[in-house]
Amino acid sequence: MLAMKDKPWLLLFGLLAALSCLASFGDAAYPYYGTKIGALTRLHHGVSGDVYAVDSRTIFIKKFNYDGEAPAAYFYVGNTARPSNEGAARLRDERGGTASLTRRYRNKDVTLSLPEGKTLRDIKWFSVWCDEFAVNFGDVSIPPNLDFPRPQKISALRGVHGVSSDNIVIVDAQTLLVPNFSYDGEAPDAKFWVGRGQRPTSDGLRIPDENGKENPLRRYERKTIVLTLPEDLTIFDIGHFGVWCEAFTVDFGHVRLPEGLNVPPSLKMLGISPQSKLNCEVLYDDLAFEVRWAVAGESIVVQLVAKLEPNHYMSFGISPNKNISQMIGADAVVAWVDPQTGNGFATDYFLEGKAQCSGGRGACPDTKISEKTNSIRLLNAAMVNGYSIVTYQRSLAATDRLDLPISITGAESVVWAIGPLNDYQEVSFHTFYNKHLHQIEFGRQPKWNCPLPEGARGNSNSSEQEDSAPAAQSSTGGAGYPPAGRPNVEPDEEFYENRAEALHRQPPQRRQETAIITQRRPVPTPKPVNSNGAWDIPAIQCHEPEDGVFYAQMGPTGGKHGYPAITGHVGWGISWYINGLLIPEIHVVRGKTYTFVVEGGNNPDIPAKYHPFYISDDPVGGYEHKREEEKKAVRIYAGVHRSRSGQVTPTGVGRLCNWTPDVEGPPADDYQSFGAYQRTLTLKCDAGEPGVITWKPDRNTPDTVYYHCFTHRYLGWKIHVHDSCDSEAGGLKGAASERHEIRLPAKATVAEPAPVHEDYAGEASVRHETKVSANDNFLLKHQTDLIKNHNMNGTPPKLSFEITKSSEITKLISDGIRAAEALEESLLRNPNLNPNHPNQNPIPNPHQKPNVTPTEISSRPEILLGETHAHTLNASPSASAYPSPSATLPSANLKLPILAAGPHLIHHPPHLHRLHHQPQHAPHPHVHLHHHNLTANLPALAQKTIGLSEFLRPPQNAPLFHPVKLPGRRPFPAPIKKVPASRPILPQQHPHLHPHPQQHPVLLQQQPSLIVSHYRKPIPGLLKPFVKEKPFPLQPLAASVLLLGQPTELGGLNNKGERLKIKGKPKIPVPYVDLEPQGSLQNTAIFNQPGGKGKGDQKPKASSVSISTTPIPLVKRPTVKEPSQEEIASMRPAVNQGFKPDTVIVESGFKPIVRTDGTGVQLPKEIIDQVAHRREDPGTEIDEVMETDTLFLAAQQGGSETQSFEPMFIPSPLDSTNATKVLRVNVKEVSPTASALRLPSAALEHALPSASELIKPTLDELFAEDLNEEELEMEPMPVADDVESLEETTKKDAVTTTINIPRNTTKKPDPDLLEDLFGPDEEELYADELELDMDDRVAAAAERIDTYYLPPDNRKIPDTRVPSGALYTFDGKSVVDSSLVLPPKLDAPDNANVHQRHAQYGLTPLEQLVRTTPQFGVYRGELPQEFRGTEPQPVSEYSHPAPFSRTTPVFSSSSGSTIYPYSSSTGASTSTVSSSASSPLSSSSLRPISTKLQLLKPEGRRA
């Protein structure tokens, strides 16, 4: 409690602060005047009235009456037993006068102040006394234990956004003093807020700030402010006060107001103007410089007001000479207000001289002269309508040697000045000052000698005006100011008890039955913001996540790039994070049940940490604070419980998990992508359990609903509801893991092709790895991971290469590349065919037509690698270059295969924005067969020196570390493989045949021997740091980079003997991640070839027209026997049957879509069938070729056969870093055997010291153990125990797709047979694919781009160096969760079931759901800097391989996939681990191990 005698300046401070918002004063309707003392006894001259104690020094008389006839009547107080003038004190009248009461009072409200130094505790009675006759006209006794009103202290503010203060003081019924108030000013619509009840709601009222304005609050830094309740609102009408964000219905902090507070009534309630209690004098009228003051006990409260220029000060002080206004030696206060921040300053100065302060001399602050000498207390500062207002308090007496006392008994000479501030925020020489004597009497009765503030009404001091005023209108105050507290209906005296309320006081009750008169203003809607620069937040597609579980947590809005730019609404600081993404749009399907794990806070006492989750059709949210009419228009679908009475209670309530940004990092506005910003966030969770709600949208659910917070507005975003997940509207049209193949008709009769829809634009989609790859230091040690962990699209920047000189590798590479480069340059210079070529017979051209440059089409479709296309050169837009009957050539309906990707996932590499030049073909009567994967179609770019010699320069368009194709020949038809094309497929480029008068057969052109990149991919992000700094030193890796792929054969072109030595290529195990849907070609011969060993002389299927039988010598191939006329007549018509969906093997999540509308010319059905089922060319161990260049070169020298490799993708394992490290240890246990691609260990160590540790087991070793057919059907991986454990260890996160290999293959291939050219027939491989079908589906699921935050593994022995509850996510970020603590330390790995372990350690089913369910989706940012330079620990620190017992695959009922233990596809293993397995791997988590967990392993766990 604060007694007024101790803090008398509080009321005066409130008076001065009220002047800043005087216009808000109105009429108060509630009759509260303080504690009632009693009624005056009616003795003489009609004296009557009710006496109230306003505070310890103020008495209020309600409806005072006196006839004014007595000659010497005065107001008296005394402490004697009865009223008397002996020992009594005479009071000044309501006007401050000391004259006797000579005028008449009729129901006047009179306010009187006790003499200085006296309080109500010091007196016993109050009376109207006549001195001349010593007669008491009327009196009232004052009880000794009177509980008079006084200011009350309540709690301090504490909340979010930096809201804080010291204990708030309720000065009177309408005034609050908030000392040292702070607020960060970040919210867009924060207001001071009051209302009924104990917690803020949207039904409350905003109150003006200290300047009387209702603008959103600015930043406050420990500023003491005075707030006045508006109009007739009092503290008895409200139950709380705080800071509230009105637009978002968010409580930033509040305090409760206790009931029954005994506080003084405000001056407005007593009908007193502030001017009647304050003094004011004008100092300089031109700048409206005024000084206002009031003496309060031993101190004085002063307020300076002036219209100042920016960076100017105003000063006021006491002159050392009472007779003149002298500057030198004066004690002054210098004050100013910063217009930018609104902060005010008041500094105690001693004017030692006229110069600026220097070394304690001149006009200096007291603290610059002597420490702890500042005697000024700043109370308030404001900038109102351009006026600077500063209120401060100081003692009347001098407190140190630099101060001067202020006398209240006489006049004081004062000084003042206005001038600019210097760079040190100190005074410089004044511009305006008082040049003459100016004296002020500070102890006088309040007198307002200044212009009235705006909103104030003039005084009516004339007794004639008062007397002539009607009695009904004479209830003005003593000073003539109309009272603010004028009730509409005057209560009778019986309304109050007609006795003293000292002993039985009834505190004023809140008007619960009366509504606040102030009309509620509509809640403002945040104004729209600019959506430019919004982060690209990936939507959660309808197939993600597979289990339908969403984690809803809180996090920051992301600055101007986040919530405001995404939604168009202003964010107030926090918003929902769904699966780790900032307010993503969610796609769901009707009829499917979804689960939302809510972690938004469960403490309703702290509204800023209480965010129930619910789904409705309302785009705003905040259902709890809506009006009843607004609630009726909202339909809620999930997250609430509605009782029978209609009461709605939120159910989506759980513990609080908050994504917390780095306080020391840059602000969110500095991040250009959400991925980069997300890496700075750390998930922090309170103790407790999350809330879980389920939702199943049905046919009545609208297409768009919204997820929001039940108690706050604008925290969530949209949910799109679809009927099916397969439709484009289902969110799949842009999924990175889905590709849709369609066929569009092309019109051959029109020169310009039909425009292609932009949704079908065949451009490369962005591919996102499912795991973060290793850093650059790790790449230097593992070449295999370098090649496997790269993207598959795009072209990297041109890089420099360096190869160690004077080595055998350099010489070998130089010889091979020199020949290839020379051949490439010759073909680039001479694109036209030479009719005089020695190996090419000239062909007559009776229908020669001029060449026409093909028309560029708008799309850039993907074409088929190795597919042979026929080029038809059109002479005119309307006619074909070669006449063909329309009945046999329906080219108008020609369908082109175009691979479409979603528009938001289409990637535009730089090289795709320009078309390759088409070589000028010489006119020929036949159709050109063109291979689109040749660099002959590339523009001849200027060659630049990149660190290699002329013949060692890699191809200009080849990416770094990509296998390339060297000179070689490929027969027709080539395997079809899709690669991104940089040029469109023109109608004349599609393969079809044309009739000629000479009936020439289709020529099979030899494929030019050019270096072709089989991979088009931008440089991996993990390579960028060291690639940019310096050229990457390629010492052992150069050979594998340049020579990987099909080896160069520089022998004779027609050397059939050499080609006969090519052995059949066995099938190899390839980690299945991202393969194209392909099958195996059938061994059906297209052409009858002499000497061939085909299954039968099958006749070719004519594509569209008949073929001539005229024999023409061909290059590299014997003359084929053309079909006869009878055979041609018996052929089926060339009708385009469309692409058959049943011929597609869906792999890696790709779902081709085939449009079958219309017919057209295409390849024969046999070719299409074979291509559809074509799997990767089963080459020899290409992984071993990529292992080191030494292995590759040794195989070329030691082997007698030339291995032929088809282009093939080498996908990255889902956790390749761990896989490689484990493999390096395990391979030492395998005994190597002879292989064409292996060398003795001594040779390896001589050429490459680390190569011996990089050797993988050979194929013979991998399949050294025989398995019967039953085992083959049961296990797709027929390998030995050790090898099986190796495979499981290597690929914990991906299922390995293994192609079964016959044990003994001795058949020599015949290059003229399709069977030997493309591997086994379709029937042989189709049986293998049936066994692998389950694995393929699992691989497709594991290959998805979803990446999850996984809870900690409770089965591992905890590391003492890692704090309990801390773990690392997939990208190396720490997650702090106080509830995710590890169980007691395990002595040894046990073999108990996982669920039994959970029960043993007391895990509830809800905790199991949280720990075994992914929590957020893919992360697409860049690798943080700390991991780019992190040195990986040795393999032995965290790799302890141990053999596993043979396990039985687990079949998932949801997808029908074969799942192995320790696969990421399941949350728990159902197989039993061998009890002999003692390595940590045997008890590892059922989920994939993070690649960054190596940083947490203890040093003592080395192998």
Swiss-Prot record:
GO CC annotations on file: cytoplasm; microtubule; nucleolus; nucleus; polytene chromosome; spindle
BP GO annotations: cell division; meiotic cell cycle; nucleus organization; spindle assembly
Methyltransferase is among the record's keywords: no
Database matches in InterPro entries: DM13_domain (IPR019545), DOH_DOMON (IPR045266), DOMON_domain (IPR005018), Spindle_Org/Thrombomodulin (IPR052126)
Region (Disordered): 451-491, 830-857, 1086-1106, 1426-1503
Ranges of compositional bias, category Low complexity: 830-840, 1452-1491
Signal peptide segment: 1-28
Subcellular localization: Cytoplasm, Cytoskeleton, Spindle; Nucleus, Nucleolus; Chromosome
Domain DM13: 34-143, 151-258
DOMON domain mapped to chain residues: 287-419
A single GO molecular function term of this UniProt record: structural molecule activity
Keyword set includes RNA-binding: no
Superkingdom of origin: Eukaryota
Main location (coarse class): cytoplasm
Protein keywords: Cell cycle, Cell division, Chromosome, Cytoplasm, Cytoskeleton, Meiosis, Microtubule, Mitosis, Nucleus, Repeat, Signal
Biological function: Provides structural support to stabilize and organize the microtubule spindle during mitosis (within embryonic somatic cells) and meiosis (within spermatocytes). The role in mitosis regulation depends on the Ran pathway.
Subunit structure, as described in the record: Interacts with Chro and Mgtor as part of a macromolecular complex forming the spindle matrix. Chro colocalizes with Skeletor (Skel) on the chromosomes at interphase and on spindle during metaphase.
Stated name of the protein: Protein Skeletor, isoforms D/E
This protein's encoding gene: Skel
